[in-house]
A protein has these predicted regions:
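Extracellular/periplasmic juxtamembrane segments that couple receptor/chemosensory ectodomains to their
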Residues: 1-61, 250-389, 585-656
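Extracytoplasmic/periplasmic sensory segments of membrane signal-transduction proteins
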Residues: 15-167, 348-495, 549-552
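Solvent-exposed, extracytoplasmic
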Residues: 112-126, 201-259, 296-319, 435-449, ...
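Extracytoplasmic/periplasmic ligand-binding sensor regions of membrane-associated signaling proteins
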Residues: 116-117, 121-205, 210-213, 259-273, ...
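The feature marks the first
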Residues: 657-702
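DNA polymerase processivity clamps
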Residues: 669, 698, 704-707, 722-750
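Flexible, small-/acidic-enriched active-site or ligand-binding loops
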Residues: 688-711, 757-792
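Mixed-charge, glycine-accented linear interaction segment located at domain edges/termini
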Residues: 769-770, 774-830
Length: 830
């Protein structure tokens, strides 16, 4: 953490400088410095506390950033696998009810070649499988695809488990069906006849190694030194993004939690993060875990994250720790301003040791400027770390959302093509039959595949002849004409591998809501060149897409996500006001993105500044990667930046200097302060001190003209000095910051002035001071003189404290004299 170490060194040097100034002041001008040394000591102690807190926060945020990125990847590795395997449990269950497979086993006759041709079509569509086996009750292989024809040996153990299980069996390890492999992931399911009698077992071999290689490619980052692993329930590595580094079968020590831990592996230290599977649709997975390891020496390598300058920080972040540190830094700045300002007031118009004090005050001021610069850089680094971490998290989640969507729609393309090959559909359309039997067939599928609102079948002319009825109105659907564009596309499909997808638009087949409808051609039995109709499957897009977004959305307030087309047309969103079909102004967010690419950026949505991550669809396997179909969708994940809090103040704004044009000791000194955008002043001789606002005790709400009273000890005892809110007097809006109290005295009495900031104590000559123009003197009774500070410098208004006191007394009608009676125990808060 080079940036943290550099900050720590700078802060240590400042701490030494503070002590040196204090020691020098005690030696050079002990009497004059005595009044400010306690405040200096208090400020130094606060600086020390903040130094510790700031370094700790910087280190913690850097660690948090690394762990957050590791956790996201570890979680994604296992969750993407589990989501995929959930689909496999559904596949084996559905295919085990296939009439062709049942008929083949029931007949116990020849027909293997025909069945294997059908299974070959299945594996061409569902390319996540590399082998399919149909076993009889003796365990013999009756049909197989993806292995050598001579392979007839079954797997007795797998057969026994599948025949006894009420559902699917998930097997990972050695399998007699695939003897050449060290391990295989196989899904098995008993094949039952329509009367419930067992006929055999169906086994699907999942392309596990190929799938994991694809997942690792998706989540690998440029210049990546992290190793992504998949661990089994016993902690053994079953997949590795770098098997030369972390081979299969190893057991990383300390792979126990998602919060990150330091572990030893192969003689090196790593930061490691392990995540359990979230589960999907009630399926918990095989008990596997995602694990990510990053070498400790490279984990905190600085990464350039474009934050687009001041615009990134001006809005602040909703981080309580950062706000607290900024507030503490602001309080130290205020305290330092008061030390210097009070010292300047005390040293004003004096000679001798007081000139030495002025020199010391100059050193304090310069050191304070250094301190503010260091804190400003450190706070900017802390803010940038938090922001870059958030931006990278949003980008990663957008990529994950897009990957999940692509994988989901890959299944939709497979389903429509496979169901189009159903013999019942081919024979019915070729013979011109429709009717209730086809509707029942479609209902049976729809009950198992609830991601679809409706399945329908139509002839070559586009007229619907059958529809599932689970969503209602099947009778109204039959006879309806399918969109001509879809019919033309289906009639032109070249092979059983081809499919067509409607644009995302409203459809009467989906309650007039926008959706995608996947189409495949139904071909004549025995003649794949003749199209006799088509099947359309209506995706339940609003529900399913919103579920994808919601399940993957980061758990933090203000985050939202959307799937959009490149032009910003919304497909789905987690925001209620972004309905499907509406528009989201993406600006240049997705411009120039290639397939599978992602980025993060700061962008305005609806006039509100957001951090956002965006990813463009990459497709999955052959889906959208082979020229079969193009639909450039993007996933957007965004977090609104809150308005800067009162604590998020500009720590770069140091103690300003307003210089008068006179040699020291020859002019009149003024104590200058700021109120909103105005510079005001009082004669330095009329200033007792600048006090911390926390010393003020409220009167009423503390927000009126009289803010409260300031207890002040002097030789005469305790006095409560009324404190006036000058913003209320000048009809200015309430300030966000804390402010200071300038305690003054005049012939009328003592008065505290609540101001925004302290500027300086400056000496002005006769040429710098102007009388109030007669035209405005009557209107502005509180204005005593005008101070000219030079070209392009602010005009300073010197206050007439006696006139101001009289005006205030008239306005509050006795509140000043009765202030002690209205005293409350509360402390004024800004």
């Amino acid at each position: 953490m080079r940036s943290v170490l550099a900050c720590e060194r700078e802060l240590a040097e400042l701490r030494f400088t503070w002590r040196l100034i204090e020691t020098t002041a005690k030696m050079v001008c002990p009497a004059e410095a005595k009044t400010i040394l306690p405040a200096m000591a208090s400020t130094r102690e606060a600086f020390g506390r903040l130094e510790t807190e700031l370094v700790r926060a910087l280190a913690a945020e850097n660690v948090n950033k690394v762990v957050l990125q590791m956790r996201a990847r570890a979680q994604a590795v296992v969750d993407v696998v589990v989501r995929n395997l959930y689909e496999r449990t559904a596949d084996v269950g559905f295919l085990a009810t296939d009439d062709d497979i049942r008929g083949f086993l029931r007949a116990n006759a020849n027909g293997r070649e025909r069945l294997e041709a059908r299974l070959h079509e299945y594996i061409r569509k569902y390319s996540v499988y590399d082998a399919i086996f149909v076993l009889d009750l003796r365990g013999e292989v009756r049909a197989a695809i993806g292995v050598s024809p001579e392979s007839t040996a079954g797997d007795p153990s797998l057969l026994e488990r599948a025949l006894a299980a009420p559902g699917y069996v998930e097997h990972f390890g050695r399998c007699a069906l695939l003897p050449e492999r060290e391990r295989a992931l196989v899904y098995a399911r008993r094949i039952d006849d329509t009367d419930g009698r067992a006929l055999g077992v169906l086994c699907l071999s999942f392309r596990f190694d190929d799938e994991m290689a694809g997942i690792f490619r998706t989540f690998r980052r440029p210049r990546d030194r992290a190793v992504m692993l998949l661990l089994d329930a016993d902690g053994h590595v079953i997949a590795s993004s770098d098997p030369d580094h972390v081979p299969l079968g190893r057991t990383p020590e300390g792979a126990t939690g998602a919060d990150g831990a330091l572990i030893d592996f192969g003689g090196r230290e790593y930061i490691a993060c392990t995540c359990e599977a979230t589960g999907y649709q009630g399926y918990a997975g095989p008990g596997w875990r995602g694990h990510v390891m990053v070498p400790a020496e490279s984990a905190f390598r600085e990464e350039a994250v474009a934050l687009q300058g001041a615009g990134a920080r001006s809005s602040g972040l909703n981080c309580s720790e950062l706000a607290t540190i900024e507030a503490q830094a602001g309080a130290i700045k205020d305290a330092l301003n008061r030390v210097v300002w009070n010292g300047q007031v005390m040293a004003g118009g004096r000679r001798g040791d007081s000139l030495k004090l002025k020199s010391m005050l100059q050193q304090i001021s310069e050191t304070g400027e250094r301190m503010r610069a260091v804190f400003s850089r450190a706070l900017a680094a802390l803010s940038d770390t938090i922001m870059s971490s958030t931006l990278q998290d949003l980008q990663f989640v957008s990529r994950l959302m897009m990957d999940v969507m692509d994988r989901n729609l890959y299944e939709r393309a497979n389903d429509c093509r496979w169901w189009a090959l159903a013999p019942a559909l081919r024979e019915a359309l070729a013979s011109g039959r429709g009717g209730s039997s086809l509707g029942t067939f479609l209902d049976d599928i729809n009950r198992l595949y609830t991601v679809y609102d409706r399945l329908f079948v139509y002839g070559a002319d586009g007229r619907i002849v059958a529809s599932s009825s689970l969503s209602g109105a099947a009778d109204d659907t039959i006879g309806r004409q399918v969109d001509g564009r879809a019919v033309d596309a289906v009639n032109r499909l070249a092979s059983t591998q081809s499919y067509a997808v409607s644009p995302f638009e409203a459809s009467p087949l989906h309650r007039d809501a926008p959706t995608y409808i996947y189409h495949a051609a139904i071909r004549a039995p025995g003649d794949d060149t003749r199209v006799v109709g088509g099947i359309g499957i209506v995706f339940e897009s609003a529900r399913e897409f919103r579920a994808m977004l919601s399940e993957l959305l980061p758990a933090r307030d203000g985050v939202w996500a959307a799937f959009c087309e490149r032009d910003g047309r919304v497909v789905a969103s987690t925001r209620q006001d972004l309905e499907p079909g509406s528009r989201l102004d993406l600006g240049e967010l997705a411009a120039g993105l290639d397939a599978g690419a992602s980025r993060h950026a700061l962008i305005d949505f609806d006039g509100v500044r957001h951090m956002a991550g965006v990813a463009l669809s990459a497709g999955y396997r052959e889906y959208k990667t082979t020229g079969d179909y193009r639909n450039d969708l993007v996933a957007v994940v965004a977090l609104a930046l809150p308005e800067a809090s009162a604590a998020a103040r500009d720590t770069d704004a140091g103690l300003g200097e307003i210089e008068g044009g006179v040699r020291p000791g020859e002019g009149e000194e003024f104590a200058v302060f700021r109120l909103d955008d105005r510079h005001l002043a009082v004669s330095a001789g009329q200033v007792l001190e600048a006090a911390d606002i926390d010393r003020v005790r409220r009167i009423g709400s503390g927000e009126g003209l009289v803010a409260g009273v300031l207890p002040l000890d002097d030789a005469g005892g305790l006095e409560h000095v009324p404190v006036v809110n000058l913003r209320v007097f000048f009809d200015l809006p309430r300030a966000d910051g804390r402010g200071h109290v300038v305690v003054t005295h005049s012939a009328r009495g003592r008065l505290g002035l609540l101001v925004d900031d302290l500027i300086s104590v400056t000496e002005c000559g006769p040429n710098d001071i102007r009388p109030v123009p007669e035209m405005v003197a009557g209107r502005f009774r509180w204005l005593d003189r005008l101070i000219i500070t030079g070209r392009d410098r602010p005009l300073v208004s010197a206050l007439d404290l006696d006139a101001l006191y009289d005006m205030l007394r008239d306005q509050v009608r006795g509140e000043l004299s009765d202030a002690d009676c209205m005293l409350q125990d509360e402390v004024l808060s800004a």
